[in-house]
Amino acid sequence: MIQQETYLNVADNSGAKKLRVIRVIGGFHKKYGTVGDIVVCSVREAIPNSDVKKGDVVRAVIVRTKKEIRRSDGTYIRFDDNAAVLIDKFNAPRGTRIFGPVARELREKGFMKIVSLAPEVW
């Protein structure tokens, strides 16, 4: 459950390290985001000399949440951290590598490029 002011780790090599959520995209007054939702974020930490700078406003897709996700077969999945991957306006990842596992729900939401770059899909 990702909401406004939530801090997210960045799971790619775009240059950002920490993000703070400004808004969850979708719906009318959508309060919470989960895996596969797009969020507008502010970069709070970034590595030097990277494409992304501290204070930049970026779009990202949530790939991991600490709050469990219920699947249609009745199983639940949760991760150790809240993480996102930066995306451009065409929903393609800005980085070239993805770190850590991502949820299978991304495939259903249409983020096939992120799923193909990820080392593990749970």
Swiss-Prot record:
SUPFAM superfamilies: Ribosomal protein L14. GO terms for molecular function: large ribosomal subunit rRNA binding; structural constituent of ribosome. SMART domains: Ribosomal_L14. GO terms for biological process: translation. GO terms for cellular component: cytosolic large ribosomal subunit. InterPro entries: Ribosomal_uL14, Ribosomal_uL14_bac-type, Ribosomal_uL14_CS, Ribosomal_uL14_sf. It comes from the Bacteria. Keywords: Ribonucleoprotein, Ribosomal protein, RNA-binding, rRNA-binding. The keyword Ribosomal protein applies. Part of the 50S ribosomal subunit. Forms a cluster with proteins L3 and L19. In the 70S ribosome, L14 and L19 interact and together make contacts with the 16S rRNA in bridges B5 and B8. Binds to 23S rRNA. Forms part of two intersubunit bridges in the 70S ribosome. Belongs to the universal ribosomal protein uL14 family. This is Large ribosomal subunit protein uL14. It comes from Thermotoga petrophila (strain ATCC BAA-488 / DSM 13995 / JCM 10881 / RKU-1). The gene is rplN.
